[in-house]
């Protein structure tokens, strides 16, 4: 796998803004919009991910709503494979399957079109999102993909928030790659 140098990691980290007390007091939010509006940093990141994934025989990239759409669609275009959105309930127009998952206080749910990976038997899918914290959404997405005729062969995150332990939980289900760990 193509690894970044510490200097390259520091460069990407320098383009991500920390916002204190968002969305609630005590939280430090990793704002990726500053990376997205830095064309050099975004192109560097996408070129890096293309090097990592271009020869892995992946059939589809699935991105988790909403920031996973940004990275997933850009990477899919760069390595010339289809992109599949994983969405919140009632956002997809055709027949869907869904997966519920636990939150700190309650439950949430994600959906995918029932035929999202049609045309490729035993499709190999890369799951992508901007960051992983507790891993609840990512675990649900892996389960959702695996409910179809496909297999999630790897999950990729721009940022792994190590203290929350989500990457370790998802690693029990599929291979993990995080560009940055904080």
From Swiss-Prot:
Known catalytic reactions: AMP + diphosphate = 5-phospho-alpha-D-ribose 1-diphosphate + adenine
UniProt-annotated location(s): Cytoplasm
EC number: 2.4.2.7
Alphabetical list of Gene3D superfamilies matching this protein: 3.40.50.2020
Pathway: Purine metabolism; AMP biosynthesis via salvage pathway; AMP from adenine: step 1/1
GO cellular component, one term: cytoplasm
Pfam families, A to Z: Pribosyltran
GO process annotations (BP): adenine salvage; AMP salvage; purine ribonucleoside salvage
Enzyme class: transferase
Record's keyword terms, sorted: Cytoplasm, Glycosyltransferase, Purine salvage, Transferase
GO MF entries: adenine binding; adenine phosphoribosyltransferase activity; AMP binding
PROSITE patterns, per the entry: PUR_PYR_PR_TRANSFER
Record CDD domains: PRTases_typeI
Entry superkingdom: Bacteria
SUPFAM superfamilies in UniProt: PRTase-like
Main location: cytoplasm
Keyword Glycosyltransferase recorded: yes
Family that this chain belongs to: Belongs to the purine/pyrimidine phosphoribosyltransferase family.
Function: Catalyzes a salvage reaction resulting in the formation of AMP, that is energically less costly than de novo synthesis.
Record note on quaternary structure: Homodimer.
Official protein name in the record: Adenine phosphoribosyltransferase
Species in which this protein is naturally found: Campylobacter hominis (strain ATCC BAA-381 / DSM 21671 / CCUG 45161 / LMG 19568 / NCTC 13146 / CH001A)
Gene: apt
